[in-house]
UniProtKB/Swiss-Prot annotation:
Species: Caenorhabditis elegans
Chain intervals with Acidic residues compositional bias: 1086-1097
Pfam families, per the entry: R3H (PF01424), zf-NF-X1 (PF01422)
Zinc finger region(s), RING-type: 235-287
SUPFAM superfamilies: R3H domain (SSF82708), RING/U-box (SSF57850)
PROSITE patterns (alphabetical): R3H (PS51061), ZF_RING_2 (PS50089)
Localisation: Nucleus
Chain positions of all zinc fingers (NF-X1-type): 330-348, 383-402, 439-458, 500-523, 565-584, 592-611, 649-668, 703-726, 735-756
Polar residues bias: start-end ranges: 113-128, 174-193, 1032-1041
Family, similarity comment: Belongs to the NFX1 family.
Full protein name: Transcriptional repressor NF-X1 homolog
GO cellular component: nucleus
Lineage: Eukaryota, Metazoa, Ecdysozoa, Nematoda, Chromadorea
Length: 1119
């Protein structure tokens, strides 16, 4: 034992890495397979290296060293089983690779799984307590084997075995040293570090491209052998590789290989059998049914159970001749060694007859090639009368195609049938026979039959009773001798059962005994509809008619229940169904957008489209491929290569390969000419063919007179058949206005009244309006006629109006042909009075100096908080007044559109615009609500004091209540310079600058009412009040006096109720005596209060200027 321990090695000598992995298994048993090597053989012996559960070997009793030493110094740890057999060739210089240590399949699968590379992680995750327990059990087994070995050393047979063992260990050490020289990076030791390196070397690597090409060119059998020998075949269930030490099962149909040792195919078969509910299970790949459960591990040919792996042979094979049956009925068994996959074709030749058996030919045995000749088949067909006329063919000859004519029994309706054994027999056509009975008088009433018609139904021998059957002919004293003799009747009631009546209580025939069928029943029958909801009584004849047609009585009620699909209703009359199944086809478009749902109408969404293509799907450029199966409607695979489709431009392609039919438009910026050829536009995307420059087209139209006034466009200026509709621009001779008739091309203008708008006014210029030119001519003509008539009357000449007088008239050039009204007269009178009083007035007779201006608290608050906004609005209002008074505006109104602003700012604009007599209106919807200002000629003017000037008046903004400004006193106070500094300011600059005004005690003010500017000539009325009301020009009372109501009823702005402090109303009151005296002392001249009456002007001015406002509660206005 000492020599053995000194020279033995526990490292297997096989070059296959799987043997090393198997040798490191925990608790695994190994044995040598008996094999004949040569003529000189010794006893068979199994070499079983005892493995430590932690990866190291445990030595024998003579030498016990640590687990971390090298393999060369641990040869004594090899233990042998004396009862095992081993075949050894002493002449061999090295160890025979066929005698390698093999895996014993009798060991349970967990032992096998622990030695494979796929379960290394599970070994590391095993609890240390279980590893110690398992290691103790294995150590006990090793000790028992050592004792048995020591006891058997003195036996002669054991001594020879020991010598063989020594030689085996020497060969193993030599082989291991050769491996170490060839691969010095590999750790030959038995330490855990060496095992970790070997585990890293066993990492699964995918197939290379060269291996894939090799496997594609090889047959299935050779490809399976290559993958199994290199441990690269994967189980189709667990997706782990199958090693040479694992038990497998191979399908005989598809030749796929699955694990048995790890329980993959066994669990699959068990679940498949339970699911099918039969004694068979299906293959996972080809679905072939199998009866035998895959519990046992057999070789590929099925002869050897638990085959042992030998280096140089196909893994999982027995190494013997396959002997399997070949395809296509080849009688010769397979001569190859046990192998996976299908057997190769037989290489022998045999004589094979053609399908018709007339020609023989030598073909390869087991080939599926059919031998066919060029002669007619000639085999007898199934009819037994005709032969096959086809050329030599495979399979059955088929049915006879000869058409024969088959007669019926009565001979009325023959038919054509294909030749068959029964084609020569007659058949029954179903019509009445029309043959004669034996009496030769009556015709047969039977259907077409094969035998004779027989005896007459009314023969003397067949009828022996009366028609009702109650009395015999003998009792009635009548003897019939032939069929034509009358059948006697009795006097009793027929009483035969009729088909009408309720079930079980059918009616009886109430007629006397009679021949032939019973007459119709005159009674009624109670019926119940099929669904049981309707009952009724109908005549028996109607009941019989219903029974003949439908077979049951139906009511008219339609079922309204929904069917199983939940969409359609039953709609069946007299429905008796418990479950209403919808049998309509769904026919909805599936998710793929190509196919339709072929199921019956159902609830919910349709199933996804199950159609699939098994062809490879390529992208448009062919660079990217998607392997089958391809779901129906799947888009082309995403490709990262540039698009290779032809494009309309020469720019570089910036988009990738795509599946859409059209490429994205080219966005390269280019220069292109506009539609009309006016200019070249730059920075135009390439995909835009043409562009408009925005200039007027100005292409000549078909009329030859006008040009196109549309913006630069691409289509034709005029549609086909369209005429020019523009107005003729030829100048008229009389009024010098354009013709304005529809375009008449080069033809002269037709005489027509001129309808051009002309601005005319009265003599004083106050009244202005627009009128057609033809009407103006008539007015001027009538005026000239009157002037000529007056002139002729004064001179005593006849009235003569020469042609062309209108054009030479000075009145026509001024267009002041209208008459002045009473308002004009009143303004003229006021102007003259003002001139007499030396009062400064404007062109419309309005006083330029107003005595008092009162600004409400809200406007004062806006001035104090947002003076910039106040000045901007004030500038716009002043510009409007300047433009409307400058005479540049063609019309009497001028508008300005302010930008969008908040509701507080809009309220300020509405109130402040009233001081300018400018109308304001809110437009649009929040939050883009804005204001449109409208100034009117003759009404809108600038106030004497602007609200922005309040900052120049001391205390005007700080004093509570409205600010009332007295223009005449303020101007004098501001213009007077201070003589000395440090003295008290005059009283007029402090006390009389701002006056606190109280509201009227008898009137409740409910809404802010902006005030109008007072006019000291408002008391002057017109001579005729009715003329003033009918005037076209609005009077002072019609001026804009209150802002629109939208600023306090804006629901979208979300108003909050606030507490208004007070409302401002201008009220005229008399000054106290102290105030009058103080004013007289300060001023040299009289004040404005001395120029008018103290009572009437104030009252009438307020009533004339203030516009009535609707009294509404404050809360409602704010909401």
């Amino acid at each position: 034992m000492a020599d053995t321990e000194g020279t033995s090695s526990s490292i297997p000598t096989s070059t296959n890495s799987s043997r090393h992995r198997a040798s490191r298994g925990r608790g695994g048993r190994f044995r040598q397979a008996p094999r004949q090597v040569g003529a000189n053989t010794a006893d068979n012996l199994d070499a079983a290296p005892l493995m430590n559960p932690r990866g190291g070997h445990r030595g024998g009793s003579g030498n016990k060293r640590g687990r971390g030493q090298k393999e060369a110094t641990s040869a004594s740890r090899l233990q042998m089983q004396p009862e095992a057999n081993f075949t050894f060739n002493p002449n061999a210089a090295t160890f025979n690779p066929a005698q390698s240590v093999l895996f014993d399949p009798s060991v349970p699968p967990p032992t096998i799984g622990a030695s494979t590379h796929s379960n290394q992680n599970s070994r590391q995750q095993e609890p240390s307590q279980n590893r110690r327990r398992r290691g103790g059990q294995q150590n006990t087994q090793r000790r028992q084997l050592e004792i048995q070995e020591q006891r058997g050393d003195s036996h002669p047979q054991n001594q020879s075995r020991q010598n063989n063992r020594n030689q085996l260990n020497v060969d193993r050490i030599a082989n291991q040293q050769n491996k170490s020289v060839q691969n010095p990076s590999r750790n030959p030791g038995n330490s855990r570090r060496g095992q970790g390196a070997r585990r890293r070397e066993q990492k699964e690597e995918p197939l290379t491209e060269e291996e894939t090409k090799i496997l594609a060119d090889k047959p299935l059998r050779e490809g399976l052998v290559y993958l199994l020998e290199n441990n690269k075949y994967e189980c189709a269930i667990c997706y782990t590789r199958i090693t040479t030490r694992q038990g497998v099962w191979s399908c005989k149909t598809c030749y796929h290989i699955f694990h048995i040792s790890t329980g993959c195919i066994t669990d699959w078969a068990r679940s498949s059998r339970d699911k099918e509910g039969a004694n068979t299970w299906r293959c996972p790949t080809c679905q072939t049914e199998n009866e035998t459960m895959p519990y046992n591990y057999y070789c590929f040919c099925g002869r050897m159970r638990n085959p042992n792996f030998r280096v140089g042979e196909v893994p999982h094979s027995c190494g013997e001749t396959c002997g399997g049956a070949r395809k296509f009925g080849c009688p010769h068994p397979c001569t190859e060694l046990c192998h996976p996959g299908p057997c190769i074709e037989c290489k022998l030749f045999t004589t094979k007859s053609c399908n018709c058996g007339k020609t023989k030919k030598s073909v390869r045995c087991g080939s599926d090639q059919e031998v066919m000749c060029e002669t007619v088949c000639g085999k007898q067909l199934s009819c037994g009368q005709h032969n096959c006329e086809r050329i030599c063919h495979s399979g059955d000859c088929g049915e006879c195609t000869v058409i024969l004519e088959q007669d019926c029994f009565c001979g009325k309706t023959p038919k054509e049938v294909s030749c068959n054994p029964c084609a020569h027999e007659k058949y029954s056509c179903g019509s009445e026979c029309d043959g004669m009975f034996s009496c030769g008088i009556h015709h047969c009433t039977k259907k077409c039959h094969d035998k004779e018609c027989g005896e007459c139904e009314t023969g003397a021998n067949r009828i022996r009773t009366c028609p009702c059957g109650r009395n015999t002919l003998q009792s009635l004293g009548v003897t019939r001798k032939k069929c034509t003799d009358m059948v006697p009747t009795c006097d009793s009631v027929c009483d035969k059962w009729l088909t009408c009546g309720t079930p079980g209580k059918n009616h009886h025939c109430r007629e006397k005994c009679h021949e032939g069928p019973c007459p119709p029943c005159n009674l009624n029958t109670s019926v119940i509809c099929r669904c049981g909801t309707s009952k009724g009584v109908i005549p028996c004849d109607e009941y019989l008619q219903i029974m003949k047609t439908t077979g049951e009585y139906l009511c008219t009620k339609r079922c309204r229940k929904k069917k199983s699909c939940g969409m359609h209703k039953c709609q069946e009359v007299c429905c008796i169904q418990d479950e209403h199944f919808c049998l309509q086809m769904c026919n909805k478009r599936l998710s793929c957008g190509i196919h339709t749902c072929e199921n019956v109408c159902h609830a919910g969404q349709c199933r996804p489209c199950l159609q699939a293509s098994f062809d490879e799907q390529f992208c448009h450029c062919g660079h990217t491929v998607r392997m089958p199966p391809i779901p129906c409607g799947a888009r082309l695979p995403v490709c990262s290569q540039p698009c290779v489709r032809p494009h309309s431009c020469d720019h570089s392609v910036s988009h990738k390969c795509h599946g859409e039919q059209n490429c994205p438009p080219c966005t390269q910026l280019t220069e292109k000419m506009c539609y009309g050829g006016h200019r070249v536009r730059k920075n135009i995307p390439c995909h835009i063919d043409s562009v408009s420059c925005g200039v007027v087209c100005k292409k000549p139209l078909k009329c030859g007179v006008h040009v196109c006034q549309r913006t630069c466009h691409g289509e034709e200026c005029e549609k086909e058949g369209e005429k020019c509709t523009k107005k003729c621009e030829t100048i008229r001779e009389l009024c010098e206005h354009p013709c304005a008739l529809p375009c008449h091309e080069d033809s002269p203008c037709e005489p027509s009244p001129c309808k051009a708008s002309v601005r005319i006014s009265c003599e004083c210029g106050r009244i202005k309006k627009d009128a057609p030119c033809c009407e103006v001519d008539k007015m001027i003509l009538s005026k000239l006629e009157k002037e000529e008539e007056e002139k002729s009357e004064s001179d005593g000449e006849e009235k003569v109006v020469k042609e062309g007088i209108l054009k030479r008239s000075t009145s026509f050039s001024q267009l002041n042909c209208m008459k002045c009204d009473d308002e004009c007269k009143k303004l003229e009178r006021n102007r003259k009075v003002a001139e007499a009083l030396e009062v400064d007035t404007d062109e419309y007779g309005m006083n330029k100096l107003a005595p008092t201006i009162s600004f409400p608290c809200y406007l004062k608050e806006m001035v104090r908080t947002n003076i910039d906004f106040v000045k901007s609005v004030e500038k716009i209002l002043i510009d409007l007044v300047i433009q409307i008074l400058s005479g540049e505006a063609y019309h009497d109104t001028f508008r300005a559109h302010l930008p969008a602003m908040s509701i507080e700012k809009r309220r300020f604009v509405h109130e402040y615009a009233n001081f300018f007599n400018i109308a304001s209106e809110s437009v649009d919807s929040p939050p883009k609500r804005s204001i449109v200002l409208t100034a009117v000629r003759g009404k809108s003017h600038q106030p004497l004091v602007l609200i922005s000037d309040l900052v120049n008046y001391k205390g005007a903004l700080k004093t509570p209540g409205p600010a009332v400004i007295r223009k005449d006193i303020m101007d004098q106070a501001l213009s007077k310079k201070e003589e000395t500094e440090g003295l008290m300011k005059p009283l007029r600059c402090t006390e009389k600058m701002v006056v606190r005004r109280e509201a009227r005690p008898m009137k409740e003010i409910t809404a802010p009412i902006p005030l109008k500017q007072q006019n000291q000539f408002a008391l002057l009325g017109s001579d005729v009040d009715s003329d003033d009301e009918e005037s076209n020009v609005p009077t002072t009372s019609n001026l804009v006096s209150s802002p629109p109501k939208d600023w306090w009823k804006d629901e979208e702005e979300g108003w909050q109720k606030v507490q208004q402090k007070e409302y401002v109303v201008e009220v005229e009151r008399d000054m106290t005596e102290d105030e009058i005296e103080a004013a007289k002392k300060l001023d040299e001249g009289p004040t404005w209060e001395d120029q008018c009456d103290e009572d009437a002007p104030a009252t009438e001015t307020s009533s004339a200027i203030e516009s009535p406002a609707k009294e509404e509660p404050v809360a409602e206005l704010l909401e």
